[in-house]
Design a protein with these regions (language model features):
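Membrane-embedded beta-barrel scaffold of Gram-negative outer-membrane proteins
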Residues: 284-302, 421-424, 450-508, 513-517
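Surface-exposed extracellular loop regions of Gram-negative outer-membrane beta-barrel proteins
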Residues: 248, 388-393, 397-403, 409-456, ...
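N-terminal periplasmic "start-of-domain" segments of outer-membrane beta-barrel proteins
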Residues: 21-49
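C-terminal beta-signal and adjacent terminal beta-strands/loops
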Residues: 579-586, 594-596, 605-651
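A beta-strand signature from Gram-negative outer-membrane beta-barrel systems
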Residues: 113-159
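Flexible loop and strand-edge segments within Gram-negative outer membrane beta-barrel domains
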Residues: 199-201, 211-221, 229-287, 293-320, ...
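Extracytoplasmic beta-strand/coil segments of soluble accessory domains associated
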Residues: 56, 60-97
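Gram-negative outer-membrane beta-barrel transporters
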Residues: 333, 338, 375-378, 473-482, ...
Length: 651
């Protein structure tokens, strides 16, 4: 993953909002190398070079990531990092955390890759301390940044793209905006996706293999976004965003031999509005405030004669109101202090008679410090979290309060070399989701939060540009994670399962990443990106249990990805691959639940024509070129060989 270089001595939390000049060392290195915590960024300009075709593909290119993908365009895609589970991964969109208090998981398939200017992953605490407290309330974070309006350019800026592919896939996309005067700008984006997802798959039948075709798997997604930016002066910025997403998809269900029939469907609607204002109050103080309201609706239907009236119709509505304020102080060069206060309210309503309509008040306060001097950077954070749940129907209020610390250091042993050593620790706890607490015959209101401790030690290196190599970044990180009060499902009786705090999990491993670019001839280069992860995530609940010291479900020991691109003036070519070793779908690691490892390869070719200040790009992709047959989630087969082609015009 490649991002724009920043000066090793810069402080990104303060440089953008203060005029104070910070001490700068002569060595330059990207953020991935100088950060006190593992950080990986993929910028939009790197997507073509890496052969990335979707947001799940982008996530696959980051070390330590386990993606749960149910297959097909628009299929549910959630992220687990370093064996902690998707509920421990926070996802923010343009600076505001995305929330799903019902399940605790964010479906990344909702977000269009075309609308992303960059996507970053931070494991532990972000080095930027001028952020909402909620951003620090997750073990790891995925940060998505969309395109910003272009300030000061009054001409109409237009980008239009059309993508078509196998299995009936078609997706138009448009981005249009312009400046209003010298200090205002607007931007509108929209996209639509349709796919039949009727791909073939193989299913074993004794000693034979039977070929089937996915049915009841079509999807229609639509998304629009409106952005407005105003800069009243050189030190203040107001951003306003409205987001709307609408999706209808049929659900094929698990693949079962001789039973490919399904009548399930899911309707999703999500909309939110947010506004943020950032300003410099004085030479040493800066302020950032943000407000957001989010509304989402899910409707699940299953038409089957076993239900009264022949149909199961479950409807859920979630609402969230969120406000945050952050104050940054830079009293002297190299020292930054910040305080953040966040409040958010969540509730959940459904048409289920037994549902008790819970709501939650959350208050987070973060006190942060960062110090940088030439070869040394240190960060520290204390996060106070207060949660109050009101289950409803006369149930007693549930309260949890906890103070969690984190700290990190990065130092450069030799000032003439971009070689860094980093150490960091983060303690955090996760509140149970509404499903885990209140779901009928499943949840338990007596659950305690999960407590997580993360330790990381890493080495990073950036080679200064040479005649034979223009860029080389290498990172190696080892880690140890421990989770107490792990929330697991256990059988209450023969028919009913319930949630309880029985689990303890320990995870340890090594993450490696490498990015390199080699100039070949004039206007030609070879660009290489790769990552590898070795991970053991083990159940440590009880020695007399069958799952003692067994690998967690869907957690491979080995995983990795790579891409090699030949950039040239004619037709640029990319080869890429990702894969993982075998996994198990159950905690007991029974042989019958083993999922085979896989390695998927793909190829891409693209060229950009430039004329009269405009651009026209043509691109073709061969996906899963060698037709690998595999499952990421048990009984949800992934597509085999497929293709896509796109044309993009920029005015």
């Amino acid at each position: 993953m490649v991002s724009g270089p920043i000066t090793a001595g810069q402080q990104p939390d303060s440089a953008s909002v203060t005029l104070q000049t910070l001490e700068v060392s002569s060595a330059k290195a990207p953020k991935e190398v100088v950060s006190v915590a593992p950080t990986h960024t993929i910028a939009n300009r790197d997507l073509d070079k890496m052969g990335i075709t979707g947001i799940s593909d982008a996530i696959h290119r980051m070390p330590g990531v386990i993606l749960r993908d149910y297959g097909g365009a628009g299929g549910l895609k959630t992220v687990s990092i370093r064996g902690l589970g998707p509920q421990h991964t926070g996802v923010s969109y343009d600076g505001a955390q995305l929330g799903d208090t019902q399940s605790g998981q964010i479906d990344l398939s909702r977000y269009s890759l075309d609308n992303i200017s960059d996507i970053s992953m931070v494991i532990g605490d972000n080095e930027d301390i001028f952020m909402p407290a909620r951003t620090a309330a997750a073990s790891s974070s995925i940060m998505i940044s969309s395109w910003n309006p272009v300030m000061g350019d009054r001409k109409l800026n237009l980008t239009a793209k059309l993508t078509a592919g196998a299995f009936g896939y078609v997706s138009p996309y448009i981005r249009v905006g312009s400046g209003i005067g010298d200090n205002m700008a607007w931007l509108f984006t929209g996209d639509y996706i349709h796919s039949n997802n009727n791909y073939t798959f193989s299913i074993p039948n004794g000693s034979e293999t039977v070929k089937e075709r996915r049915s009841n798997s079509d999807i229609d997604n639509g998304h629009i976004e409106a952005n407005f930016q105003w800069k009243p002066n050189s030190i203040s910025t107001l951003n306003v965003k409205y987001y709307y997403f609408d999706s209808f998809r049929h659900l094929p269900g698990p693949a079962i031999l001789y039973n490919n029939e399904s009548h399930e469907a899911l309707k999703d609607v999500n909309m939110f509005g947010q506004a943020s204002y950032r300003t410099r109050l004085s030479k040493i103080f800066s302020l950032n405030i943000l407000g957001k309201f989010n509304w989402s609706k899910n409707r699940y239907t299953d038409r089957d004669g076993k239900y009264p009236g022949g149909v199961l119709d479950n409807r859920y509505i979630q609402r969230e109101a969120y406000a945050t304020a952050s104050l940054l102080c830079v009293p002297v060069s190299g020292l930054s202090l910040s305080y953040a206060f966040d409040y958010f309210y969540n509730d959940l309503h459904s048409n289920l008679k037994q549902h008790n309509r819970p709501h939650r008040n959350s208050i987070l306060q973060g006190l942060n410090a960062k110090y940088h001097y030439r070869w040394f950077t240190a960060t520290a954070r204390a996060l106070l979290s207060v949660y109050q749940d009101f289950p409803g129907d006369g149930e007693k209020k549930i309260s949890h309060t906890r103070l969690t610390p984190s700290a990190g250091v990065s130092f450069q042993p030799w000032m003439n070399q971009n070689f860094f050593i980093r150490l960091n620790y983060k303690g955090i706890f996760r509140m149970p989701t509404f499903n885990e607490l209140y779901f009928d015959h499943f949840g338990s209101i007596n659950l305690n939060p999960e407590i997580t401790n993360q330790f990381n030690a890493g080495l990073t290196y950036n080679l200064k540009p040479q005649s034979w190599i223009s860029n080389l970044n290498v990172t190696v990180d080892g880690y140890f994670n421990r989770v107490k009060n792990k929330i697991v499902a256990v059988p209450y009786n023969m028919f009913v399962w319930t949630m309880t705090n029985l689990g303890r999990v320990e995870a340890y491993g090594i993450d490696l990443s490498l990015n390199a670019e080699f100039p070949v001839y004039a206007r030609q280069s070879i660009v290489c990106n790769g990552n590898y992860s070795w991970q053991k995530a083990l159940s440590k609940t009880s020695r007399d249990k069958l799952d003692w010291n067994k690998q967690l479900p869907y957690t491979p020991v080995h995983s990795g990805a790579f891409s090699v691109a030949w950039e040239n003036p004619w037709v640029s070519l990319v080869a890429h691959s990702y894969g993982c070793s075998a996994r198990y779908s159950t905690t007991n690691n029974l042989p019958g639940t083993r999922l085979h490892g896989y390695m998927e390869f793909g190829f891409a070719a693209y060229h950009t024509f430039r004329f009269h200040g405009h651009e026209l790009q043509l691109r073709a992709d061969l996906i899963n070129a060698f037709d690998a047959r595999y499952e990421i989630v048990a009984r949800y087969p992934m597509p085999g060989r497929s293709w896509s082609a796109s044309i993009r015009f920029t005015l």
